[in-house]
Design a protein with these regions (language model features):
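Short catalytic/metal-binding and nucleic-acid-binding patches
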Residues: 1-185
Length: 185
C-alpha cells in the first residue's frame, strides 16, 4: 500500500472542478504532489532533522515493535511523508497511531501546543502488482530530488530507505511505547 500524509496547513483549497477534469485519481495525485513539493505554502517542519528523526524512529518502531506493518520504502519531505507498506492492522489505526505519536513528540521538540501538526486526511492506494510496486518505490526514490530536498540518509528529511537500510540506520526508541487494554503494545 502507498500512503501519503501532510503537515497541517500545507494543502491549498482545490476547487471541485479540478477533480472533474481528470477522473483518474492516481494521475491527479501525482500532478498535485509534484506541484505541492515545490510550493512554499504552510509549515516545513520536516526539514528540521530533529523532527524528521521523530518520524523515522516512529516508522521503525511501528514495524519492529508494534508489528503494525511491513515497511518497504519511505521518504520524508519538508511538508509530507510517503510510505510503501504492507499493513498488519487497519490502515486507519496505523495512521492514527503514527500521526498522534509523531505529532506529540514533534510539538514537544518545537515547543508548540494547541495546534494541529498533521493534516487530518491522508491519501492511500493499494499496490496491485510487482510492477506497480517497483514504480511506486522508484517514485519515492526520485521524489526528494524532484522536490529539491537534500538526500542525507535515514535520520533526516528527504531520506528514502529500503527495508534493510531502515533496520540498520534507525534505532527503535523506547518513548513510543503505548498502553492499550492494560497491556504494553
Amino acid at each position: 500500500m502507498f500512503v501519503t500524509w501532510r503537515l497541517a496547513g500545507t494543502l491549498p483549497q482545490v476547487p471541485a472542478e479540478v477533480f472533474r477534469r481528470d477522473p483518474h485519481p492516481g494521475r491527479f495525485f501525482l500532478a498535485q504532489d509534484r506541484r505541492l513539493d515545490s510550493t512554499p505554502q504552510g509549515p516545513r517542519w520536516l526539514q528540521d532533522p530533529r523532527i524528521a528523526r521523530v518520524v523515522a524512529e516512529a516508522l521503525a518502531y511501528g514495524e519492529r515493535v508494534r508489528r503494525a506493518y511491513d515497511l518497504f520504502a519511505w521518504v520524508i519531505l519538508p511538508n509530507h511523508v510517503h510510505l510503501v507498506l504492507r499493513p498488519q492492522r487497519t490502515l486507519s489505526a496505523i495512521l492514527r497511531w503514527l500521526k498522534s505519536a509523531t505529532a506529540t513528540r514533534a510539538n514537544r521538540v518545537l515547543g508548540k501546543t494547541g495546534e494541529a501538526f498533521w493534516q487530518r486526511e491522508y491519501f492511500d492506494h493499494w499496490i496491485r502488482s510487482e510492477k506497480e510496486l517497483a514504480s511506486v518505490v522508484a517514485y519515492l526514490e526520485a521524489n526528494p530530488v524532484k522536490a529539491g530536498s537534500e538526500y542525507t540518509g535515514g535520520k533526516t528529511a528527504g531520506a528514502t530507505q529500503d527495508h534493510a537500510a531502515l533496520r540498520k540506520n534507525v534505532e527503535t526508541p523506547g518513548s513510543y511505547r503505548t498502553h492499550s487494554g492494560g497491556r504494553r503494545t
